[in-house]
Amino acid sequence: SKNLNRIFYNLKFNNNKSNLKEKLFEIKFKHLFFYFIKKYLLYFLNKINFFKKRKASLWSLHIYNYSKNFIKKINIKKSTKIESPKNAEWADPFIFSYKNKNYVFFENNDLNLNRGKISFGELHGNDLINIKDILKFKYHLSYPFIWKSKNNFYLIPETSEKKSIHIWKAKKFPSQWKYFKTILKNEFCCDTTIIKDKSNNNWLLTNKSNDSSNDPNNELYVYKIIGNFRKLIPHKLNPVITDCRTARNAGKLLIPNKLFRPSQINDSTGYGIGLNINNIDKLNLDSYEERTVKRIFPYKIPNTDGLHHINNSDKHIVFDVRYII
């Protein structure tokens, strides 16, 4: 009987062992199967994105005349394209009204050098005239944010290549500027914007990269401005946003009794594919809260695949659109 029990035990053990091997094989096979599916699916998706990226594309400025409540009623299809020279790409427009004239400041990218400079022009109807260069260096410039404080005009372009934020002050607005100050030295900052809250506090919002990737799309940093840039107090929650789909600044919207922050929509399908209009609900040194109230995509305009900047004056909206050519 002992021998029989031993035989049955060995048979059962070997059978369990065989089942265990089969189960382990099945698990390994499933893991390998899903691994290769994932690997080759990502490969083909990357190939698709690669060919998409190979399509030539250029940013262009658009102008749109509006009335009240434009956040709800904006129709970019009604906008007018501002034609740029053949060897140039125009983007990141900011519009400023001064002495009954409207001036548009923008990134003027020289396609021969692939380097941006800061230019401006006077709005005449739906076109820009008297275009002049105001900042031009051997490094890239973009996002010419204009800020007025106590009758002084300041220009804060994107100068991430220099790993600092350079501020310029107008000697004679809008055409003559002099260097004023450098802030956030040794920091890779992009698309710096200043907003004023209901208590008249000024806040600096910028996108930073803190690693070797130099990717500014993922994080938003906030600083309270003391005096005339005498001091910057960092927000306690910095970075207040860590999401490439909503973090990066995309211009400025001036709406009475509202605090909006436009931001770029960046995701796995591409860079600057559209805009978020975010309402800032809470802003102090201890907390930051915003919610997206509208998204704007360029697809109503034929042959486009991007829209990543917006700004307004009392009667006009300017934005940029990326055309597939």
Please place each PLM-identified region on the residue numbering.
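Conserved anion/nucleotide-ligand pocket segment
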Residues: 1-29
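Carbohydrate-active catalytic/glycan-binding domains of CAZyme proteins
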Residues: 1-4, 32-325
